[in-house]
Amino acid sequence: MDNDSQYSGYSYKSGQSRSSRKHRDRRERHRSKSREGSRGDKSVTIQAPGEPLLDNESTRGEDRDDNWGETTTVVTGTSEHSISHDDITRITKDMEDSAKLDCSRHLGVVIAGALALLSFLTPIAFMLLPQILWREDLEQCGTACEGLFISVAFKLLILLLGSWALFFRRPKAFFPRVFVFRALLMVLVFLLVVSYWLFYGVRILESRDKNYQGIVQYAVSLVDALLFVHYLAVVLLELRQLQPQFTIKVVRSTDGASRFYNIGHLSIQRVAVWILENYYHDFPVYNPALLNLPKSILSKKMSGFKVYSLGEENNTNNSTGQSRAVIAAAARRRDNSHNEYYYEEAEHERRVRKRKARLVVAVEEAFTHIKRLQDEDPKNPREIMDPREAAQAIFASMARAMQKYLRTTKQQPYHTMESILQHLEFCITHDMTPKAFLERYLGPGPTIQYHKDRWLAKQWTLVSEEPVTNGLKDGVVFELKRQDFSLVVSTKKIPFFKLSEEFVDPKSHKFVMRLQSETSV
């Protein structure tokens, strides 16, 4: 009965012949195989242009021997430049979104530039308009008045340089909402300039004031006010956020990689941009190939048992005993995936150590084949190579070990042959050791060191229950989403610490020797 249940999953107690049961079992096995085969035919793998020419079975490096892939031939055709309907839709959407973002960004820059130009030219206009409109009626400008011209000139120069350094920097990101403090400062500058113009028009232009020194002092007061506004901008935009107030935890949703940061008072959208700046150099590169369990564990299916009693009623007790035996056997064979996972991990670590040792030895031997040419050495034109040629010459001896190691550690999508050659050329040019060359490949590095096509996301989505213009508060949680994973951010306020002082007299540190009969001094 146990043998029959291994094939069909069921145990029958009937008067059918053994040959009919075997025929039925053979037919059911054939059907199951045909269903699995037809189901497997629907799996299609599309390789994006520019990726390494490694098929989908290259990720199953554990099932291959060490010599697999040496004579493999890959045939590529026009599918290298193929594109799907989903790709076209995504590209169109990205273009529309980027067009909207560019328009909004340029509009903000235009408004800020126009306001800055207005505030910068207003003091100059205050001093020039009387000279143009009623020059003959103006009083003479004495020495003190002429000294104010120098003061205005240098203050305007300082204001121009400070505004350029603070406001006209290249933006690091496009925010979904208006930056509140920056908008408030722009409104403050606009109200200040308009107020000065109103007072100037009513008290100076209409009355044609003849005191030119007073007019110049009025322009100087506007420049001083603008300098104070610039100081306020430095405090609100730069200094306010320097004092740490919160501790934030950033967790990548797929693999659980996390980091902790201390941060000051910032809005949620600015915190999101600050997190993304730190994410690319603090978090290891996202590798989806490392997330799944081995296929040998995932593909294992437990057999189900059903026991039917088709005989007479007096065999009820016997049937019940048989069913209990079958259930007990199934319980003994209960899923032992944790054991298989343990041995799979141990075998994988052993294979990684072995191929790492081969790679280290291959790179060490390859670097011994070249040396920098000194000025006093005899020069043979046939033996002289530039760094690129030297990298290509020694790469062949380490290529096989490098390929197997990257395949075993599942890093092959992030290192193309061209990128490895460029890194090797860089190391040769700067006289770096083999260990310095291998540093990039022996472990997952920060995200930003890889090619942008592998990690750069054009757009992140900020998901928050709080308005993104609000400042951080204790317990605030928000997400930064992209297509394949998200960053979950939780906030905790730094606690308030209360310290007390206790004075200890240095003369109180006195000791005595506790001697016993067995003590040896």
Curated annotation (Swiss-Prot):
Family from the record: Belongs to the Vang family.
One BP term from GO: negative regulation of canonical Wnt signaling pathway
InterPro entries, A to Z: VANGL
Residue spans crossing the bilayer: 109-129, 148-168, 179-199, 219-239
Region (Disordered): 1-73
Tissue expression summary: During gastrulation, broadly expressed in the dorsal region in both mesodermal and neural tissues. From the neurula stages, expressed throughout the neural tube. In tailbud stages, expression declines in the anterior notochord but remains strong in the posterior notochord and in the neural tube. Also weakly expressed in the prenephritic region of late tailbud embryos.
Gene this chain is encoded by: vangl2-b
Membrane topology summary: Multi-pass membrane protein
Subunit structure as annotated in this protein's UniProt entry: Interacts with dvl/dsh. Interacts with prickle3.
Main subcellular location: membrane
Bias-annotated ranges (Low complexity): 1-18
Basic and acidic residues biased stretches: 57-67
The protein's name: Vang-like protein 2-B
GO cellular component, one term: plasma membrane
Extracellular side: 130-147, 200-218
